[in-house]
């Protein structure tokens, strides 16, 4: 295929690069989710980086560029169950304000759900 347009992502090399980037984001999330649950608590690095990676994947997928890959929707749903169980079990220990806790929960759930929806849409196209 080579090059199919003038855009920054309209060639095979860019598609390969995007695939490498999305694979890295997915691998980081998968590794964090398979690891020690303490590492994904809300005040830990992966507790912050996991939802950030998921949002980055959503942003990339919405662009429709060749090369962006997403995990299966069922995998995302399992990650959501695991992550939210850890989050719910540890957030109160950080003594957040009730408003922040509710808002953050909404954002986290939306982050997982939007990515799963994007994957399902990709599968149906």
Predicted regions and their residues:
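Amphipathic alpha-helical binding modules
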Residues: 78-125
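Residue-level signature of the C-terminal ends
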Residues: 24, 59-63, 115-118
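Short amphipathic alpha-helical heptad-repeat segments
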Residues: 21-29, 75-87
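Helix-start/N-cap signature of alpha-helical segments
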Residues: 7, 42-50, 100
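Charged, low-complexity interaction regions
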Residues: 37-45, 65-67, 92-96
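Short terminal alpha-helical segments
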Residues: 1-42
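HEAT/armadillo-like alpha-solenoid scaffolds in large eukaryotic assembly and transport factors
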Residues: 64-76
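Amphipathic alpha-helical elements of HEAT/ARM-like alpha-solenoid repeat scaffolds that form extended
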Residues: 2, 10-13, 46-61, 92-93, ...
């Amino acid at each position: 295929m080579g090059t199919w347009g003038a855009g920054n992502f309209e060639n095979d090399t860019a598609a390969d690069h995007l695939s490498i980037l999305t694979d890295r984001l997915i691998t980081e999330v998968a590794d964090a989710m398979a690891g020690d649950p303490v590492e994904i608590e809300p005040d830990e690095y992966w507790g912050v980086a996991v939802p950030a990676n998921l949002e980055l994947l959503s942003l990339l997928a919405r662009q429709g560029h060749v090369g962006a890959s997403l995990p299966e929707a069922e995998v995302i749903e399992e990650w959501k169950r695991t992550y939210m169980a850890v989050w719910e079990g540890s957030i109160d220990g950080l003594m957040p304000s009730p408003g922040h806790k509710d808002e953050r929960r909404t954002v986290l759930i939306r982050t997982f759900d939007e990515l799963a929806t994007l994957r399902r849409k990709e599968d149906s196209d």
